[in-house]
UniProtKB/Swiss-Prot annotation:
Pfam family, one: HypA
Zinc keyword on record: yes
Organism expressing this protein natively: Geotalea daltonii (strain DSM 22248 / JCM 15807 / FRC-32) (Geobacter daltonii)
Gene behind this protein: hypA
Disulfide partners: none
One GO-annotated biological process of the protein: protein modification process
Role of this protein: Involved in the maturation of [NiFe] hydrogenases. Required for nickel insertion into the metal center of the hydrogenase.
InterPro entries documented for this protein: Hydgase_Ni_incorp_HypA/HybF_CS (IPR020538), HypA/HybF (IPR000688)
The protein's name in its UniProt record: Hydrogenase maturation factor HypA
């Protein structure tokens, strides 16, 4: 379960940026193709924040849908899986634009 190490990293990032103040909420972005299980992150976050500046902090998760750009016709389209063909031309080569995100977007401190 790599969500535990991700949750630890989120706590570390927030602690470094909180300036010694208590953190009330943390907002993270998780892309649809990131491979991160939202419920596991929530569970691990709660466990990792005990006894820290983030204890009892609210974890807000923003889901980022996947989108891609066709290498053949340059069309942008929503992606459900990395091997989806382009709906405009049927091409199979694409570059992901969004969907792999995993980042701390912001935090609220007191």
């Amino acid at each position: 379960m790599h969500e535990l190490s991700i949750a630890r990293s989120v706590v570390d990032i927030c602690t470094e940026n909180a300036g010694g103040r208590r953190v009330c909420s943390v907002t993270i972005e998780i892309g649809a193709l990131s491979g991160v299980a939202t419920e596991s992150i929530r569970f691990c976050f709660d466990a990792c924040t005990r006894g820290t500046l983030l204890e009892n902090a609210l974890l807000l998760i923003e889901h980022v849908p996947a989108s891609g750009r066709c290498r053949q016709c340059n069309s942008e389209f929503p992606v459900k899986a990395c091997y989806d063909p382009c709906p405009a031309c049927g091409g199979v080569g694409m570059d992901l634009i969004t969907g792999e995100e995993l980042r701390v977007k912001g935090l609220t401190v007191v």
